[in-house]
Swiss-Prot record:
Residues 188-209 are annotated as: Disordered. Disulfide bonds: none annotated. The system is composed of three essential subunits: KdpA, KdpB and KdpC. The lineage of its organism: Bacteria, Pseudomonadati, Pseudomonadota, Alphaproteobacteria, Rhodospirillales. This is Potassium-transporting ATPase KdpC subunit. It is found in: Cell inner membrane. Residues 197-209 have a biased composition (Basic and acidic residues). Belongs to the KdpC family. It is a single-pass membrane protein. It comes from Rhodospirillum centenum (strain ATCC 51521 / SW).
Length: 209
C-alpha cells in the first residue's frame, strides 16, 4: 500500500513547495524588481515620506474644496477587507431610494453645477474601492471646488484635464480621473487651511483607511 501512496505523497509535497512557495516568491521578486511601486501597493506619499493613500483604492471626501469620490458599498466605505458592490438590482426600491437621496444631496451641495448629476457620483462600483470618477463627474463638481478654493473655474478645469487618464492601451475602458491625485494637485496649486473631519481624512493628512 505504501508503494502506491509514495508517488502521490511525493507529488503533493513537490507541488506544495512549487506552487505554494517557489512560484509566489519568484513572482514577488520579479514584481519588486520590475515594478517596485506597483508591487508595494501604488502608495502615494507626501514629501516627508508619509503615506497618504493608494492610487488603487478610493477614499471618502466630504469637504467642499475637494472633489468627491463615487459612493462605496464596501463596509463603511472603501474598506478593502469588505470589497463589494450593493448587489441590488436596478429596480430594487432600496437602491432607487438611495440613488435619489444622493442626487438631491449632490444638487444641494453643487448649486452651480450644470446638467444632470453624472451616474458614477450616485452609484457604487462593483468592488466598492474604485479610486476614479469620470471626467464628466469631475467637471460637474468644478464650480463648487473653484468657489471653495477661491479659484477661477477654468483653472480647476485645466487641473481636471491634466489629471485625466486615457484608456488602457488606447482602447480598454474609458477615460477617468483619480480623485486622490486630483485633490493633491489642488492642494499643491491652492492649499487651504482645514481640519480633518472625524473618520474622513483629507489629502495631506497622514491617515490611510
Amino acid at each position: 500500500m505504501l508503494t502506491h501512496l509514495r508517488p502521490a505523497l511525493t507529488m503533493i509535497l513537490a507541488l506544495t513547495v512549487l506552487t505554494g512557495l517557489a512560484y509566489p516568491l519568484a513572482v514577488t521578486a520579479v514584481a519588486r524588481l520590475a515594478f517596485p511601486e506597483q508591487a508595494a501597493g501604488s502608495l502615494i506619499h507626501r514629501a516627508d515620506g508619509t503615506v497618504l493613500g493608494s492610487a488603487l483604492i478610493g477614499q471618502t471626501f466630504t469637504r467642499p474644496e475637494y472633489f468627491w469620490s463615487r459612493p462605496s458599498a464596501a463596509g463603511d466605505g472603501y474598506d478593502a477587507a469588505n470589497s463589494s458592490g450593493t448587489n441590488l438590482g436596478p429596480s430594487n426600491t432600496a437602491l432607487v431610494a438611495a440613488v435619489q437621496a444622493r442626487v438631491e444631496a449632490l444638487k444641494a451641495a453643487n448649486p452651480d453645477a450644470v446638467g444632470p448629476v453624472p451616474v458614477d457620483l450616485v452609484t457604487a462600483s462593483a468592488s466598492g474601492l474604485d479610486p476614479h470618477i469620470s471626467p464628466a463627474a469631475a467637471l460637474w463638481q468644478a464650480p463648487r471646488v473653484a468657489a471653495a478654493r477661491g479659484l477661477e473655474t477654468g483653472r480647476v478645469v485645466e487641473l481636471i484635464r491634466q489629471a485625466t487618464e486615457g484608456r488602457v492601451f488606447g482602447f480598454l475602458g474609458e477615460p477617468s480621473v483619480n480623485v486622490l491625485k486630483l485633490n493633491l494637485a489642488l492642494d499643491a496649486q491652492a492649499p487651504t487651511p482645514r481640519q480633518p473631519e472625524p473618520g474622513h481624512p483629507e489629502p495631506g493628512r497622514p491617515e490611510v483607511r
